[in-house]
Swiss-Prot record:
Name assigned to this protein: DNA replication and repair protein RecF
Residue ranges crossing the lipid bilayer per the database entry: none
Organism: Chlamydia trachomatis serovar A (strain ATCC VR-571B / DSM 19440 / HAR-13)
Family named by the database record: Belongs to the RecF family.
GO aspect biological process, one term: DNA synthesis involved in DNA repair
UniProt xrefs under InterPro entries: DNA-binding_RecF, DNA-binding_RecF_CS, P-loop_NTPase, RecF/RecN/SMC_N, RecF_2
Chain residues that bind ATP: 30-37
Keywords: ATP-binding, Cytoplasm, DNA damage, DNA repair, DNA replication, DNA-binding, Nucleotide-binding, SOS response
Cellular compartments annotated: Cytoplasm
Keyword Magnesium: no
Length: 365
């Protein structure tokens, strides 16, 4: 996939902007609070229907305006598409090639974006739910079926928990079947994804720094290295049976993929406890790169890689190594307060000042 143009109307500090992007590296630089990150946010909103900066999209409406409008023209497999979103106080309207999209599950995967930002530190330092969310979002971008599976799993989980609180054993048993069916599939897909990500991750990391890194999916449902879906389902059935009394005492379901963990280690030690800030940000950047490679290799999906405020997250040596890796990832958009070296592999350099974007190099696209 390649974004050809991005149009913003009354979005954040942009009144009216049309930006043409280059096919490879696009470096956007300028002072703080000029509108650099807003451009990445716009791409992210088009991808997922939500922002990485605020829980309310209406916060992104320019002061004094009634709504914002974002539109991207992009090509996928040599076919041109248009995706737009308009947000006002009443809600949002999303159009793909002129046809309305009414559910976010229909949007995810149409316009895949992988974002690296300083907020990614939550993947390492946050709760296990942050790491589960990381895997779920990656799998959702690969397949809309996964979005359906995870949604049905949480529906079954909510219903089973309600039955537990009501002490209704008959209803608990009835909800065990869908819980096992969807939960086993979620755990299986997460585990397979993690194994493939780990292989890619280690290859990319070996190309940059010399520490030994590892990703591992930890689940009580997975007791062997390469379990089948039936193996996981059998384990889930047995664990629910054993935990039934304890579930009734506690008032909720103790076992399942909603309790699983993605473990990140460096030199066999937990990254969260035994890594420097520089190592953590480097790891996260390579993890985002691994996502891109995973989508390309497994699903022939070529997402846009967006990297926000790269000089704030990474030292120059690590940054140079990572940017060298990015050459093979397709279209990349970065932001920084520092103007990149014009002699580097950067294909397009843009300067942003007070929501005005100018092309610095090359002179024309």
């Amino acid at each position: 996939m390649r974004v050809l143009s991005l149009f913003l109307k009354d979005f954040r500090n942009y009144t009216d902007l049309r930006l043409e992007l280059g096919p490879e590296m696009n470096s956007i630089f300028g002072l703080n609070a000029q509108g650099k990150t807003n451009l990445l946010e716009a791409l992210y909103i088009l991808s997922l229907g939500r922002s990485f900066r605020t829980s309310r999209l209406t916060d992104a409406i320019r002061f004094g305006a009634s709504h914002f409008f974002i539109e991207a023209v992009f090509s996928h497999k040599e076919v041109f598409h248009t995706l737009s979103i308009q947000v006002d106080k009443k809600g949002k309207k999303i159009l793909f090639d002129g046809a309305p999209i009414t559910k976010l599950s229909e949007l995810v995967g149409l316009f895949p974006v992988i974002l690296f930002s300083i907020k990614d530190i939550a993947i390492i330092e946050g709760s296990p739910s942050e790491r589960r969310r990381f895997l779920d979002l990656l799998l959702a971008q690969a397949s809309d079926k996964y979005t359906e599976h995870i949604s049905l799993y949480h529906k079954a989980l909510d219903q089973r928990n309600a039955s537990i609180k009501a002490q209704n054993q008959k209803a608990i048993s009835a909800w065990n079947s869908p819980l096992i069916a969807y939960g086993s599939l979620v755990a299986f897909l997460r585990n397979e994804c993690t194994k493939k990500l780990n292989t890619i991750f280690q290859t990319l990391w070996d190309n940059t720094l010399k520490e030994t890194l590892s990703l591992r999916y930890e689940s009580s449902l997975i007791t062997e290295e390469s379990p089948t879906l039936n193996d996981i389902a059998s384990n889930y059935y047995e664990q629910l049976r054993i935990a039934n009394t304890k579930d009734l005492d506690l008032g909720y379901t103790m076992v399942g993929p909603h309790r699983d963990e993605l473990l990140l280690t460096i030199n066999d030690l937990p990254v969260a406890k035994f890594s420097s800030e520089g190592q953590k940000h480097s790891l996260l950047a390579v993890l985002r790169f691994a996502e891109c490679v995973y989508l390309q290799e497994e699903f022939c999906i070529h997402p846009i890689l967006c990297m926000d405020d790269i000089h704030a997250c990474l030292d120059q040596q690590r940054l140079d190594q990572l940017l060298q890796l990015s050459n093979s990832l397709g279209q990349v958009v970065t932001t920084s307060t520092i103007c990149p070296d014009h002699r580097s592999t950067t294909s397009c350099i843009f300067h942003v000042t007070q929501a005005q974007v100018s092309l610095v190099a090359p002179q024309s696209l």
